């Protein structure tokens, strides 16, 4: 009986195919990939059949065959009515107008819904079959310029979807581009912070690269080297501690914390301070140490420097054009054992003093 019934419906199939070819001329682009001649022809035939013959005709369609094998569901007429009611009963699917009756839209949605994948009703609207036009969109996104080629590759292996996946792709591409723009400054700051600790050099090599051009003498910076380190010194507050032939770099050190660290390190010879003032102090201050700004003491003692051990030597060095302050504290015969350098961001008036050793010679 089923064969005779199908033989009697051949003229309607031919008529539906002719109407389908006429509708194909009106469609410019099928972005959702729902255009399928077999499903469209059967859906058109179902639309022309009376309601009594719809259940018998739907039993022979591939969509219901896959539905019965997947979950053993009933006929297509009741479920298609539910989908039509859920979608609003119109011919518009997410802003894209589809030419044809409602059964075309419902048939394509139901065939994808009962193909074996469990999806919700909201997700089934975006689910379509693999169509050459959707593959063309994925190829365009994959071969696009710049950042389009980074996050499209893992998503290209998934089944293509409609506008929901394209919006999801654009959202991920915008976030990845924002991350790429923020990678640059953080990498530069990290390399600047780890420049001394990553090299692992020992001896006066690290000391000369950070503090002075000549590694044999401890003296102030030359004016030629201030231009190269101006940007590095003004961008961050760094403290470099040389101990045991290794350099340890610390970023964003507060001046008060640097004073405490330098006071603890110089407990045998007095306290050291990294702060600069516009006017030199006229009286001795026990908290900041018995030093005057811009002066250098080598051995012996004076009225202004009581209780100064003769073997200790302190040399503050100032850059004439840079905003950073560097002080080097060593002991005779122990130039390579330990030293502390503090770099600040404060812009103060530099003080220029001559070296007593150079004046004596």
From Swiss-Prot:
User: Bias category Polar residues: which stretches?
Assistant: 113-127, 208-232
Q: Which UniProt keywords apply?
A: Jasmonic acid signaling pathway, Nucleus, Transcription, Transcription regulation, Ubl conjugation
Q: Where is the Tify domain?
A: 232-267
- Compartments (UniProt record): Nucleus
Q: Name one Pfam family in it.
A: tify
Q: Briefly state the protein's biological role.
A: Repressor of jasmonate responses.
Compositionally biased intervals (Low complexity): 56-78
- Which residue ranges does UniProt annotate as crossing the membrane? none
Q: Just give the chief location class.
A: nucleus
The species this protein was found in: Arabidopsis thaliana
Provide the residue span(s) of the region labelled Disordered: 53-78, 113-134, 190-232, 268-361
**InterPro entries in alphabetical order:** TIFY/JAZ, Tify_dom
Which modifications occur after translation, per UniProt? Ubiquitinated. Targeted for degradation by the SCF(COI1) E3 ubiquitin ligase-proteasome pathway during jasmonate signaling.
Where are the compositionally biased (Basic and acidic residues) regions? 333-361
What assembly does the database describe for this protein?
Answer: Interacts with AFPH2/NINJA.
Q: What is this protein called?
A: Protein TIFY 8
One cellular component term (GO) for this entry is: nucleus
Family, per entry: Belongs to the TIFY/JAZ family.
């Amino acid at each position: 009986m089923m064969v005779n019934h199908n033989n009697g419906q051949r003229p309607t199939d031919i008529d539906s195919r002719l109407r389908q070819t006429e509708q194909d001329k009106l469609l410019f682009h099928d972005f959702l990939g729902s255009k399928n001649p077999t499903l469209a022809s059967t859906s058109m035939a179902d639309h022309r059949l009376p309601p009594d013959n719809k259940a018998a005709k739907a039993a022979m369609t591939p969509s219901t065959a896959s539905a019965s094998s997947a979950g053993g569901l009933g006929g297509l007429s009741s479920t298609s009515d539910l989908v039509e009611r859920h979608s609003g009963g119109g011919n518009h699917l997410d802003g894209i107008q589809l030419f044809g009756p409602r059964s075309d839209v419902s048939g394509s949605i139901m065939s994808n819904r009962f193909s074996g994948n469990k999806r919700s009703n909201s997700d089934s609207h975006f689910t379509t079959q693999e169509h050459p036009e959707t593959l063309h969109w994925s190829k365009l996104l994959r071969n696009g310029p710049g950042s389009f080629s980074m996050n499209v590759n893992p998503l290209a292996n998934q089944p293509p979807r409609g506008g929901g996946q394209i919006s999801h792709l654009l959202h991920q591409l915008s976030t990845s581009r924002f991350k790429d723009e923020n990678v640059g400054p953080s990498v530069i700051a990290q390399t600047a912070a780890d420049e001394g600790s990553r090299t692992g050099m020992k001896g006066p090599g690290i000391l000369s690269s950070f503090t002075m051009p000549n590694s044999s003498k401890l003296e102030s910076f030359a004016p030629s080297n201030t231009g190269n380190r101006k940007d590095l010194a003004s961008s961050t507050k760094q403290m470099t501690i040389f101990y045991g032939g290794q350099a340890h770099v610390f970023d964003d050190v507060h001046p008060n914390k640097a004073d405490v660290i330098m006071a603890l390190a110089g407990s045998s010879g007095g306290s050291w301070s990294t702060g600069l003032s516009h006017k030199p102090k006229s009286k001795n201050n026990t908290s900041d140490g018995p030093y005057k700004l811009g002066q250098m003491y080598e051995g012996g003692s004076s009225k202004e420097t009581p209780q100064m051990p003769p073997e200790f030597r302190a040399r503050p060095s100032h850059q004439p054009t840079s905003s950073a302050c560097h002080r080097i504290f060593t002991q005779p015969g122990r130039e390579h054992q330990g030293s502390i350098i503090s770099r600040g961001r404060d812009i103060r008036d530099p003080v220029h003093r001559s070296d007593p050793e150079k004046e004596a010679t």
